[in-house]
């Protein structure tokens, strides 16, 4: 007799929906897994799948601070942060991060996803025109939808198209990433600010992939460009360079007084716990003094970008994120397998993170990579580029 629990049949429309996903996303692949699921890296492989750009996830100072805080904090408040907005309850880390980035206030959130949705839901009245770079993170698109605003995409980093969109639809909100998470390009923030000023638009910059890596002491690209007084709002994920979890929304003090009581992600999520905040505080301390790691990160990234371009790849990256543009899903699967057989592991980006037949394999460089690692990656990529059955944009 089987011990397998009996389940009632699903409604046919649900069954059909799930069957469609299984066939469309899984069963058509050679390994009968989703395209993002290749081999498991073995010892000695070069793995470029993590956003831990400064290699802090194994930092002993940070781990010890977190461990001590877990033992010390026995007064955890497992509730929504909406109840913790008085001055005595707000974590000092919010003030520290605001001063670090150069903004008036900071609010922690559960994730970068929650930060972007909560911010746009708060600042956008229904039907507000929101001008969004085509490559901006999906959480910004979802924030527009949650706000009931109107998305007006503009071509990637194309200021002429942005101008035409604003002239056609009027004053609104411009949202961009500082460093784009798919192909590693950098937003022309000065030009975007000038456009926002000319047309009286609010400006939101997601610094998830530049906070900690760019700017003085890692304080971000906005601060590096001396635009903190011109950019209205900054959002970040603290699951990248901060190598943990949570997000943050930075802006004027008026935002901090209102968003916790308006934004659904803030109201209907539990607060970040005290021991987690201790870890984030220690991480910020380490990041501030990590100029050597930032120098090494950009050195390795430049080595990889230069080497790939010399091979013949079309590389658009200007940062520590480097993408091989592989096109179709079948070709991407073949490229992934080819590289992984040679102990080179990137992260596959496919729909819905990219457009159909616009798949990429993303290499996220980290500060602990060596010149030997880069040489190994370039050797494998040279072989892939010359392979008659593999295609690249």
From Swiss-Prot:
It is an enzyme of class 2 (transferase). GO terms for molecular function: 8-amino-7-oxononanoate synthase activity; pyridoxal phosphate binding; transaminase activity. The modification N6-(pyridoxal phosphate)lysine is found at residue 240. It comes from the Bacteria. The keyword Transferase applies. Its EC number is 2.3.-.-. GO terms for biological process: biotin biosynthetic process. Keywords: Acyltransferase, Aminotransferase, Pyridoxal phosphate, Transferase. Its cofactor is pyridoxal 5'-phosphate. Belongs to the class-II pyridoxal-phosphate-dependent aminotransferase family. PANTHER family: 8-AMINO-7-OXONONANOATE SYNTHASE, CLASS II AMINOTRANSFERASE/8-AMINO-7-OXONONANOATE SYNTHASE. Required for the synthesis of the quorum-sensing autoinducer CAI-1 ((S)-3-hydroxytridecan-4-one) which probably functions as an intragenus signal. This is CAI-1 autoinducer synthase. It comes from Vibrio campbellii (strain ATCC BAA-1116).
